[in-house]
Amino acid sequence: MCMKALTKYAWNGVLLHFKQEMTVTNEPGIYLEGKFGVRIENTLLIVPAESTAFGDFLKFETLTLAPIDTAPIVLEMLSTEEREWLNNYHCRVYESLFPYLEGNDKEWLRKATLPI
């Protein structure tokens, strides 16, 4: 897994530092001018990752548990790591939600979270 250091970000020109227990959103998207836009949004919790000689590190824990529609994904454009992330995310979604569903909803969730 690729670990990237991200310690701060800018919001409306104001520099903010990430801190434990903050929530943020990850909102990748595409917008076609004059046509439409599509965005996938996940809420993330900032949690401790590890402590080393270089300091204490944080990581993101995904809070949102909803399947991501894979129909528009061009699989050849995804790296191995991106496929693994999506499959692991869908596995977590399935395992977390399946016990609370019944009948057709269970089947819908199973299909929506199949590995790619």
Residue ranges and their predicted role:
Residues 1-116:
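Charged, cofactor-coupling segments
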